[in-house]
Regions:
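A short, active-site helix/loop in glycosyltransferases that binds the activated sugar's phosphate group
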Residues: 3-32, 37-39
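Short, structured helix-loop element that forms part of the nucleotide-activated donor/catalytic region
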Residues: 17-22, 90-115, 127
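Conserved donor-binding/catalytic core segment of Leloir-type glycosyltransferases
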Residues: 51-69, 75-78, 92
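Short alpha-helical donor nucleotide-sugar binding micro-motif in glycosyltransferases
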Residues: 122-123, 130-135
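Aromatic "clamp/platform" in nucleotide-sugar-dependent glycosyltransferases that forms part
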Residues: 143
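A short, well-ordered alpha-helix in the C-terminal region of glycosyltransferases
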Residues: 189, 196, 203-218, 224
C-alpha cells in the first residue's frame, strides 16, 4: 500500500540499480545516492612501470573475472578490431580468476596477441592509481554493474571510459563528451567504440576536463556529502 511507504525513503547508487528495483516495484520513488571517492590524483603514489605495454594507447579493465563483469565480451571486441587498428593499441586485464570461462577467454587472447594484450592478477592500490594516471581509456564490459569503482577512479584522473549500458555509470555519461556507452552487450558495438578511440587518441585526451568534472560533480567526497545532507533533510 502507498500509505506504508510514506515514511520510507529509498536511495540507490545510480539509475541501473534503481531500474532493477523498479522492474519489481515500479511504484517506489528511488533517489540517487552515489558513493564518494577521495581525490587520488592529489595524492603521492609510487610509479607503476607500464613499459611492457609498448608506449601505445592503453585500454584497461579492472575487476574479478566473472560472467557479470563481461571480460569475454571485451575479448571478443578486441578480436573484432581491424588488424591495423589493433596493432596501434595495448590492452590490459587486471583481476583474479573467479570463473574459468572468463579467464580462459583472456588467456587465449594473450596467447594469440602477446605483443599488445596483457594480464595482471593483482595490483596494489598505488599501482592502480598509477595505472589510472597513465592509461588512455578504461573499458567496462559488465553485463550488470551498479557503479563500477575502477571507472570512477579513472574519472579522477580525467580518463574517459567505454561502458556497457548495463552499468550505473552509463546513466551519467554524456556520449562523446565524458565517455562512451555501447548497447546490448554486443562485442561488435564495443569494437566500434574501441576502434574510434584507438584512431583518435587526441580526442580522448581532450575529454579530460569533462571527465574530471563528472567526477567532481557526482563522485567526489564533497558531492557525496552534499547528497547525503540533502537526503537527511528530506
Amino acid at each position: 500500500r502507498s500509505s506504508d511507504l510514506e515514511n520510507i525513503r529509498l536511495y540507490s547508487v545510480g539509475s541501473h540499480a534503481a531500474n532493477a528495483m523498479h522492474s519489481v516495484r515500479p511504484e517506489f520513488n528511488i533517489r540517487p545516492l552515489i558513493y564518494g571517492l577521495p581525490d587520488y590524483a592529489a595524492e603521492k603514489f609510487s610509479h607503476y612501470d607500464l613499459s611492457y605495454a609498448g608506449g601505445r594507447p592503453l585500454f584497461a579493465t579492472v575487476g574479478s573475472f566473472e560472467n557479470r563483469k563481461g571480460q569475454d565480451i571485451f575479448c571478443k571486441a578486441i578480436r573484432l578490431l581491424p588488424p591495423e587498428t589493433m596493432k596501434k593499441a595495448s590492452f590490459l586485464f587486471v583481476g583474479k580468476a573467479a570463473e574459468a570461462e572468463m579467464m580462459d577467454a583472456v588467456r587465449s587472447l594473450t596467447a594469440d596477441c602477446p605483443d599488445n594484450v596483457f594480464y595482471v592478477k593483482r595490483l596494489t592500490r598505488d599501482e592502480i592509481k598509477s595505472l589510472m594516471a597513465q592509461c588512455t581509456c578504461l573499458v567496462c564490459a559488465s553485463r550488470d554493474d551498479p557503479m563500477p569503482t575502477f571507472v570512477t577512479e579513472g574519472l579522477i584522473f580525467g580518463k574517459p571510459a567505454i561502458v556497457s549500458e548495463h552499468t550505473g555509470t552509463a546513466g551519467l555519461i554524456t556520449e562523446g563528451v565524458d565517455g562512451f556507452v555501447y548497447e546490448d552487450d554486443d562485442p561488435e558495438k564495443l569494437a566500434e567504440r574501441l576502434a574510434w578511440a584507438i584512431e583518435h587518441p587526441e580526442k580522448l585526451a581532450a575529454m579530460r576536463p569533462a571527465c574530471r568534472e563528472l567526477y567532481e560533480s557526482h563522485y567526489s567526497k564533497q558531492a557525496f556529502s552534499d547528497s547525503l545532507q540533502q537526503a537527511v533533510k528530506e
